[in-house]
Amino acid sequence: RPPRSTLFPYTTLFRSLAFENNIPLVAVSHIEGHIAANYLTYPQLVPPYMCLLTSGGHTAILKVEDYNQRTLIGSTIDDAVGECFDKVARVLGLGYPGGPKIDKLAKEGKSEITFCKTPLVGTYNFSFSGVKTAVINYVHNKEQKGEGINKADVAASFQEEVCGELVKKSTRAAREYGMDKLVVAGGVSANSRLKEMLKGECEKQNISLFMPELGLCTDNAAMIGSAAYFMMKKGEGLSDTNLTASSVVKI
């Protein structure tokens, strides 16, 4: 997430614009923005629904009861999924951002390497530090032995395991909470394998799947505007000119 200091200039700018033009100033959570991106792609989408949040800083399953009203069902206890993609991409020498690079490389490989299985069963929480560490150790061990690795196979195997966990828990949550709609939000929703796996599983379970168009998956101003629109309709989020920025977002 960005340092708090980087947000201050923009907060000051928007406070000034709102004051000078006598227009509302709405405080929008980054998470609310990612969720609200789906309302731009699917105008017909209305709560309630189950939401899978997948971003660089957050991974969670949320029950969305109403616009800007949600209940946390489960979340990561260590690394966020986007962060995990970035760290694995780094050890493979792919650079940043890791998500798109692993997604592209994985198409050339086979998901035949077993790294580790998540230890969290019987819960909606996630843990990605185990598979991340397993991949890093695998690569380092091969390098120490002077053995080559097939980076495409590593990328495909890692991606398959992580996406499988996201799909399994989010669809199970939707089913067990009686939700027939699953909404996906955050930058990792752009992952092609995640889309493919979610589509297949949701079709099997008769769950309607909603994923934002590619241009709205990562951080963008439109998603913030969408969230602000629904907040203003309910008279929520209106702030005065003393609004301050925060780099820590509570799910």
Could you tell me what each predicted segment is?
Residues 1-13:
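Short, small-residue-biased leader/transition segments that mark boundaries at the very start
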Residues 15-24, 43, 176, 226-231:
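Alpha-helix C-terminal capping segments
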Residues 23, 28-50, 227:
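Conserved phosphate-binding catalytic cores of ATP/NTP-utilizing and phosphoryl-transfer enzymes
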Residues 27-28, 182, 199-224:
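Conserved phosphate-binding/catalytic loops in two-lobed NTP-binding clefts
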Residues 121-129, 136-183:
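Adenine-nucleotide phosphate-binding core of ATP-dependent small-molecule kinases
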